[in-house]
Every structure is written in structure tokens, then in C-alpha cells.
Amino acid sequence: MAAFKTLDDIGNISGKRVLVRVDLNVPVADGKVTDATRIERIAPTIAELSGKGAKVILLAHFGRPKDGPSPEFSLEPIARATAEVLGRPVGFASDCVGDMAGSAVAAMNKGDVLLFENTRFYKAEEKNDPAFSERLAANGDIFVNDAFSAAHRAHSSTEGLARLLPSFAGRTMQAELEALEKGLGNPVRPVVAIVGGAKVSTKIDLLMNLVKKVDALVIGGGMANTFLAARGTDVGKSLCEHDLAPTAKQIMIEAAEAGCAIILPVDGVVAKEFKAGAACETVAISDVPADGMILDVGEKTVKTIGEWIDRAATLVWNGPLGAFEIEPFDHATVAAAKHAAARTKAGKLVSVAGGGDTVAALNHAGVADDFTYVSTAGGAFLEWMEGKPLPGVDVLKR
């Protein structure tokens, strides 16, 4: 049994008003949605609730409006895109509380789907204001949270509502939580983590948490340079946070105490400038020229990472191994991603990945669909990896 209530526990909802918190923070250009992935992810929950005769009312934020309602942050164009994905009409109410919202709900029939306007048009939303939560709850009988990506925020539409109405995890939220449980909560060992990206400073909490939970930690990207420098390696003109060398040393000490192997690059792809087609060479990590920048890990390191992926039963991945946006500095990330995907498809690996750059890198490698689970949740995924409580999830627990 899941530790949280899901749609399997919801009972008879025919004719009930179900408020569903969803993630509709999708890219929009010229009034049109350019990537509907997040809408596609919530479609099963909406279809299931609607099919059971519920009146489905969608709650979401969009962007970061500063001073109340603003046309550029309206969800109205997204209602149209949601209707296209669902293949059915989706109503739109130009407020999320008050008379306009109430009258739109009153006009609903069983199975109808309605999208409320941006919850962040009210400052009270982000303050988790109890009075605002009650105004939202007035339009619902049941609350379903299907927005894991907003679960790290204690807002009225994520945490406040769940305190006022019977609350359940939607199918997207459920899938995310079950995947994360396999990744770090209760994983099959050995567990290997790959952490890349530019800076150690943004991932200190993440690294400190992981060394206590995984058997091996592969460090790549610009952040590997900070660890190499902490070990006394000259990294030339590579991106490096020299002031964080003591932090990197402390992470390595804690890893040793916890029995977690730290895997750092033994060679690197070096160039004098960061641009497409720049002249580059692979050198041992001890031979980085003074005017060179490490922009990817080298072939020997790729081989080592592959060997660790072969040993792993579970892989957790956040961040690219090199500057994957520009060829040929995408080689290591693509090679490791394809290797992990092949192991996953063969049934030998549980692979969980997340974070914006990571998703982009796996898409670039063409293997995002072959991983066990790829989280699009951004900040919530990172906070989960950091071992921090997620208010929007905790409130759904049985």
C-alpha cells in the first residue's frame, strides 16, 4: 500500500467537485503553447476523474506575476491547448475564487472540465494564507494534487487546500513518488549517482545528502573542476569555484566515512575557447594546459563511468557531464546516457533522472523515453534529492 492516498482510494465521485492542482507552467510564444509535455502528463488524471462523473476543476500557476492580474500571465491560452490534448472542451473561468469562479462551477455538468485563472494573481497564494485557501476550497468537495513540480512549495493551492478537503495524489504525482522511492527511498543496491552541471555552490545540500545514501557518486561537469582543484590539480582556465575547495574536501571526507566512492575525471576534453567547432584535445587531468578549459570528460573517464553503470542496480542522475549544448563536448553525456538506457531496457537497471539540463541532455541523446523515470519537476526533484521535506507531498500522507 502506498504511503499516501491515490485515486484508487477516492471512492464514488460522480457529481462531486474535484479541485485538481496541476502543472501548466508550459512555454508559450505568440499566444500558443510550444511544448505540451506537461499537459500530456496530467491528461490521464483528468480523463479518469471526468470518466467517473466528477466535475473537474483545474488549479495552476503560470509564471511569476508581480502585481496581480496581467494578460501575459493568463492561463486562457493554456485552456485551449489543454482542450486539444484532451480532445474535449475545457471551460475557462477568469478568476480562481469569488463570484466568477463560483458561477462557472455552478454551471458545470458531470464530467465537465474547467480551468481556473492563475492562482498567483493573488499574493495570498504564495503566502499559504488560510483565508485564501478557504476561498479556493469553497469551490470543491475533494482535492487532488497532480503537480509534484510544485510540491516543494507550501502554497494555498498545494498545501493549504489539502488541509481543508479530503486529499489524494493524482496519477502523475503517484508515478513520480513511486519512481523516487525506487531511486533513493528504498532502492535496490548498489546505487550509483551521477551529478553534473556547472557549479558546486548550487548542489552542496544535494551532494551532502547523496554521499550518505549511494554507493558511488560520479561527479562531472564544471563542478568536477572544483573537486579536482581541492585535490591540488591545476585545472587551467576551466570553470572552477576555488573558494569552495574546503566544501569539496568536506564532501569527500563525508563520502569516505559513509563508504561512498567518489568518481572524478581522470582525463578531459580541453579547448582554449568555448564555441562550436573549437579546436580541442583530450589530455590527462594532470596535464591541463594553463590556458585550457575542460569542457567534457575524456574517453577513459567515460569508460570508468560505464563500468560503474554496469555495476549499479539503481542509477540516479542530475546534471550533464560536460558542456553538452555544443558538439563535441556532448560526447560523454550522450555515451553515458545511451549506456544507462541500454541497461534499463535490458531490465538490469532502475534509472531515475531529473532537473532541467538533465532532461534536455537525455532528449539530446534520444534516450529520455528509455529511462525508468525522467522527472520534469525541477526544484521539487532537487529538494527531494537533497532529502528535504516536500510540504505538498507530506500533507497527502495517510
Curated annotation (Swiss-Prot):
Belongs to the phosphoglycerate kinase family. The gene is pgk. It comes from Mesorhizobium japonicum (strain LMG 29417 / CECT 9101 / MAFF 303099) (Mesorhizobium loti (strain MAFF 303099)). Its EC number is 2.7.2.3. It comes from the Bacteria. This is Phosphoglycerate kinase. Keywords: ATP-binding, Cytoplasm, Glycolysis, Kinase, Nucleotide-binding, Transferase. It catalyses: (2R)-3-phosphoglycerate + ATP = (2R)-3-phospho-glyceroyl phosphate + ADP. Substrate binds at D23, L24, N25, R38, H61, F62, G63, R64, R120, R153. GO terms for molecular function: ADP binding; ATP binding; phosphoglycerate kinase activity. Pathway: Carbohydrate degradation; glycolysis; pyruvate from D-glyceraldehyde 3-phosphate: step 2/5. It is an enzyme of class 2 (transferase). Monomer. SUPFAM superfamilies: Phosphoglycerate kinase (SSF53748). It is found in: Cytoplasm. Disulfide bonds: none annotated. GO terms for cellular component: cytosol. ATP binds at K203, E325, G355, G356, D357, T358. One of its GO terms (biological process) is glycolytic process. InterPro entries: Phosphoglycerate_kinase, Phosphoglycerate_kinase_CS, Phosphoglycerate_kinase_N, Phosphoglycerate_kinase_sf.
